[in-house]
UniProtKB/Swiss-Prot annotation:
It is an enzyme of class 2 (transferase). Residues 157-206 are annotated as: Disordered. It is found in: Nucleus; Cytoplasm; Chromosome. PANTHER family: E3 UBIQUITIN-PROTEIN LIGASE RING1 / RING 2 FAMILY MEMBER, E3 UBIQUITIN-PROTEIN LIGASE RING2. One of its GO terms (biological process) is anterior/posterior axis specification. The gene is Rnf2. Transmembrane segments: none annotated. This is E3 ubiquitin-protein ligase RING2. One of its GO terms (molecular function) is chromatin binding. The modification N-acetylserine is found at residue 2. Residues 2-179 are annotated as: Interaction with HIP2. Pfam families: RAWUL (PF16207), zf-C3HC4_2 (PF13923).
Length: 308
């Protein structure tokens, strides 16, 4: 199949199209002339009537002049204005809106298939609203669950990091204590003794007679936090403002003696605050006061906790 094109020059230009094997073997489809009607579901044509950009039915159809792909007018104009100057389907270059042409015949075909276009769009909006509402609720619940998981992981990581820092700090203190003790007691003999004296500070170190500092692992020493509830004794405590339930959160290293002293100082501070006093002597006197802590073993029975 050839075609000659006459130009302004003296020689005509000839163009020849070579047919492929498929085009050579194919036979034209016979036209239906007996009045037979073929029923096709509109849903089966949805892919042909769909805009590749918004995935909805074509509206104000525009066709590209180069590759003949169809898009909604608003979709393709916005894509050319904000994106690359190319066809969204095949990536063929599109210079500007001049590379597009309206396709009213396709719009007429769509209106023929869907005569009630407004009703179809209203139905689509209702379906989308219902889907968005359901997805938003699911997304909210999923976001809350993920947030709780992330918070729990962060708390665990902070706890591990703090324990590692405490352990490294204890090792540093142990090294310095070892150096100072070695210089001070260099003339003393190291006797085989298993007794250990605990330092006065709360650095978590223990010293034996060999002047070797031993760092206590906070994880192995019960550094996990515990929550305690202190209630006034039903028969020994008077019904005053101090007879209130106290909630204390502390580490597992705390002893009964620590808790008793803490309760004494806390109650003294509350009493001074209520009276408007700020005397340091009263606070020192109150800090020396000890409270007896009982453990409720059964209904109406209490056991005294021994300070350790």
């Amino acid at each position: 199949m050839s075609q000659a094109v006459q130009t302004n020059g003296t020689q005509p230009l000839s163009k020849t199209w070579e047919l492929s094997l498929y085009e050579l073997q194919r036979t034209p489809q016979e036209a239906i002339t007996d009045g037979l009607e073929i029923v096709v579901s509109p849903r089966s044509l949805h892919s042909e009537l769909m805009c590749p950009i918004c995935l909805d039915m074509l509206k104000n159809t525009m066709t590209t002049k180069e590759c003949l792909h169809r898009f909604c007018a608003d979709c393709i104009i916005t894509a050319l204005r904000s994106g690359n100057k190319e066809c969204p389907t095949c990536r063929k270059k599109l210079v500007s809106k001049r590379s597009l042409r309206p396709d009213p015949n396709f719009d007429a075909l769509i209106s023929k298939i869907y005569p009630s276009r407004d009703e179809y769009e209203a139905h689509q909006e209702r379906v989308l609203a219902r889907i968005n509402k359901h997805n938003n609720q699911q997304a909210l619940s999923h976001s809350i669950e993920e947030g709780l998981k992330i918070q729990a992981m962060n708390r665990l990581q902070r706890g591990k990091k703090q324990q590692i820092e405490n352990g490294s700090g204890a090792e540093d203190n142990g090294d310095s204590s070892h150096c100072s003790n070695a210089s001070t007691h260099s003339n003393q003999e190291a006797g085989p003794s298993n007794k250990r004296t605990k330092t006065s500070d709360d650095s978590g170190l223990e010293l034996d007679n060999n002047n070797a500092a031993v760092a206590i692992d906070p994880v192995m020493d019960g550094a996990s936090e515990i929550e305690l509830v202190f209630r006034p004794h039903p028969t020994l405590m008077e019904k005053d403002d101090s007879a209130q339930t106290r909630y204390i959160k502390t580490s597992g290293n705390a002893t009964v003696d620590h808790l008793s002293k803490y309760l004494a100082v806390r109650l003294a501070l509350e009493e001074l605050r209520s009276k408007g006093e700020s005397n340091q002597m009263n606070l020192d006197t109150a800090s020396e006061k000890q409270y007896t802590i009982y453990i409720a073993t059964a209904s109406g029975q209490f056991t005294v906790s021994i300070c350790q």
